[in-house]
């Protein structure tokens, strides 16, 4: 087995994985940068004084890491200090542009630089992208190969084999990084030894299923899910010829790649067959060849290098096939037949043709799985089940009674003291709401932030024949589960499950949009309480398009364990000077959501422990917590955006969300995130024209998300590639 793996790797994989890095000469730092440092930085970071042991009086283009730190400090508003003279907005923008040019020109020595990492797209200041009208005409993305997503890899395996045994026996070779947010970036992943070993084993599993057969009634027959052409070649009485190998390779190419192999490829696979058949087992040799087709780069990566001669600006347009694959995997987890048919017929040659077919594909279904996938990664609500919590909790008004019962509810308890925590159901409800808004496809972002409707404890009953689906209850009470605990509808503020959905939120327990969905609130909480810091950071990064400094090494980010105080009171420790320079970007954005518990339940007051009363209560000699109500402070503030219409105090989460939804900046930042998801990279200053046009198209279409996607997928930045 190991010998065959080495043969496959040397014949098929190795030639495709060899890459050559190109580097450019580093330009000298220009006079403008030196002047800026001398004027605004050197007094505290020069020969006479080195605050933080940082010396900038001789900073040059060779000091790339130092320049990165300077850029981050200036971009985040941490330097110059407030008490020092501040550069004008125009000068600051110009300086950041110059630094970006120098840092980009410096290269990365094969390493992925910070500005290319997911969740670091905001390193490009918003003003550089939307501050002034950008000229269009030369947009392009870097030429690249992009590893398949886990879902797309499964789809590729499904094209190769229809056997049910395959899907359950494959190991995922292409797992994404375990971080929140948009994670499938082209430059982030590469082939390594463990990945290669998994791919080889998976290929063997797929081919075994393709070739699976048995002798029955004296005849060699295929098993369910096998490929007839391959099964015939596994017949013990058949001698496999070169012509059989050529036909089998062509069949595998058709299944996996929708391509015909070239003469050179056919010759290479014949040579591989001959090498493997030297031990006399020609059937096993053929299986190795079929595995090799599954292991070639085209089966596991998307190639985006462009075709033909480069234009005057060094751009090459994606070939029709490259474009068909790029469009397919932008909108789906598998190849979309319409795109490949259009490529075969020469109907992906112009931007107008691409726009027509993209619109047609988007209009055929309620929503593409990749469209919903964007919102899942953007809002980060789907991680709610990963936040471990007790599976039941006391009703706000019956918390002390619930604590006494300790979750034990005999049949004679006729009333509800608590409610169930069912995070998987909460995620389904939120996704149903997003799909509903996407189906309407108007003013999408505003509705996502401010809608007063929701789905509750929903399950879809699908009638495939009639192509309809109806809402039913996911959780239903019965004699075994109707003891002391309310159904999941309680979390949303309903007294009973609403039959007509999406239902309007009860006015006495209001909530707006995704940020007040229980799934989002739970996903942005801790095991036992709310997390204003995480919620505020999400708003700062995903809606305001700014960055939050990373937690310094050696700092223990903890608040006092004082359950007899409110969370806001306990968080006063973050106002300390050494903490506040980071927390000022997050806390006041997250604290208004104290309107809800960490289970996502609306509340009018905050329950805290009453130490004195708790000392007097016990159950079977075990102490019992007793709670008292404290006044709820729901105020907050938006700061440091540079937009006077956005900055300022808010009285509660509702005012906060409405102000964000009304903001032009928030809409533009949303467009930036959509760009990252569909392009698999962070935006750069060169993408300003693409982003501005996408934003205009979104506004002029009354907030159509489909129109926004069409704008991006028909932009020059999507259609053209440029060698770096």
Show where each model-derived region lies.
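Extended surface/linker regions that mediate inter-domain or inter-protein docking
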Residues: 98, 112, 123-244, 252, ...
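Aromatic- and Gly/Pro-enriched helix-to-coil junctions and flexible linker segments
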Residues: 20-230, 255, 259-271, 275, ...
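Active-site-adjacent structural elements in folded domains
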Residues: 234-239, 256, 273, 307-314, ...
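N-terminal secretory signal peptides that target proteins for export/translocation
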Residues: 1-3
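Bacterial N-terminal signal peptides
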Residues: 5-16
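Soluble non-cytosolic domains of exported or imported proteins
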Residues: 27, 31, 86-90, 239-247, ...
């Amino acid at each position: 087995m190991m010998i065959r793996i080495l043969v496959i790797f040397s014949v098929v994989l190795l030639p495709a994985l060899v890459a050559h890095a190109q580097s450019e000469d580093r330009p000298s730092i220009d006079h403008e940068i030196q002047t800026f440092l001398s004027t605004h930085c050197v007094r505290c970071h020069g020969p006479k004084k080195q605050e933080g042991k940082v010396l900038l009086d001789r900073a040059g283009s060779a000091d790339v890491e130092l320049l990165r730190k300077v850029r981050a400090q200036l971009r985040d508003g941490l330097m110059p200090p407030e008490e020092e003279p501040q550069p004008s907005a125009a000068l600051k923008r110009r300086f950041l542009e110059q630094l970006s040019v120098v840092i980009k020109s410096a290269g990365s020595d094969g390493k992925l630089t910070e500005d290319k990492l997911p969740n670091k797209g905001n390193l490009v200041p918003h003003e550089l992208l939307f501050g002034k009208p950008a000229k269009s005409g030369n947009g392009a993305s870097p030429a690249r190969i992009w590893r398949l997503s886990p879902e797309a890899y499964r789809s590729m395996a499904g094209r190769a084999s229809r056997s049910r045994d395959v899907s359950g026996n494959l190991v995922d070779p292409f797992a994404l990084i375990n971080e929140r947010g948009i994670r499938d970036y082209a430059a982030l992943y590469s082939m390594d030894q463990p990945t290669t070993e998994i791919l080889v084993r998976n290929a063997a599993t797929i081919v075994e299923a393709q070739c699976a057969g048995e002798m029955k009634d004296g005849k060699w027959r295929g098993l369910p899910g096998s490929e007839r052409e391959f099964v015939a070649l596994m017949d013990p009485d058949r001698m496999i010829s070169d012509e059989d190998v050529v036909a089998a390779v062509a069949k595998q190419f058709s299944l996996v790649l929708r391509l015909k192999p070239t003469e050179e490829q056919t010759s290479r696979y014949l040579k591989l067959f001959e090498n493997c058949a030297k031990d006399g087992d020609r059937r096993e040799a053929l299986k190795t060849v079929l595995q090799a087709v599954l292991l070639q780069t085209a089966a596991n990566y998307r190639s985006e290098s462009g075709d033909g001669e480069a234009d005057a600006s060094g751009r090459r347009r994606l070939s029709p096939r490259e474009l068909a694959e790029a469009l397919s995997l932008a909108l789906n987890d598998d190849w979309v037949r319409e795109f490949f048919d259009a490529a075969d017929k020469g109907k992906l040659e112009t931007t107008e043709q691409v726009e027509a077919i993209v619109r047609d594909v988007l209009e055929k279904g309620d929503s593409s799985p990749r469209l919903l996938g964007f919102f899942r990664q953007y809002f980060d609500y789907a991680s709610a089940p990963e936040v471990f919590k007790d599976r039941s909790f006391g009703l706000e008004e019956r918390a002390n009674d619930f604590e006494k019962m300790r979750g034990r509810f005999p049949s004679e308890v006729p009333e509800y003291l608590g409610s169930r925590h069912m995070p998987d159901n909460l995620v389904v409800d939120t996704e149903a709401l997003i799909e509903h808004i996407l189906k309407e496809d108007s003013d999408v972002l505003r509705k996502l932030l401010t809608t007063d409707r929701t789905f509750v404890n929903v399950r879809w009953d699908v009638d495939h024949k009639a192509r309809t689906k109806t809402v039913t209850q996911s959780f239903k009470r019965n004699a075994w589960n109707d003891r002391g605990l309310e159904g999941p509808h309680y979390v949303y503020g309903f007294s009973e499950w609403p039959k007509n959905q999406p239902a309007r939120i009860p006015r006495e327990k209001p909530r707006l949009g995704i940020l007040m969905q229980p799934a989002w609130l739970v996903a942005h909480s801790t095991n036992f309480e709310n997390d204003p810091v995480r919620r505020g950071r999400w708003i700062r990064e995903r809606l305001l398009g700014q960055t939050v400094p990373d937690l310094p090494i050696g700092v223990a980010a903890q608040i006092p364990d004082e359950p007899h105080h409110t969370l806001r009171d306990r968080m006063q420790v973050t106002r300390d000077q050494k903490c506040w320079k980071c927390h000022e970007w997050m806390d006041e954005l997250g604290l208004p959501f104290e309107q809800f518990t960490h289970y996502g339940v609306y509340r009018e007051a905050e329950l805290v422990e009453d130490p004195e009363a708790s000392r007097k209560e016990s159950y079977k000699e075990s102490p019992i917590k007793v709670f008292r109500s404290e006044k709820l402070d729901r105020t907050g503030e938006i700061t440091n955006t540079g937009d006077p219409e956005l900055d300022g105090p808010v009285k509660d989460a509702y005012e906060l969300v409405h102000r964000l939804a009304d903001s032009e900046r928030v809409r533009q930042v949303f467009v930036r995130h959509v760009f990252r998801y569909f392009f698999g990279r962070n935006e750069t200053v060169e993408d300003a024209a693409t982003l501005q046009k996408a934003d205009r198209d979104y506004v002029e279409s009354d907030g159509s998300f489909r129109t926004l996607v069409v704008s991006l997928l028909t932009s020059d930045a999507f259609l053209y590639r440029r060698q770096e």
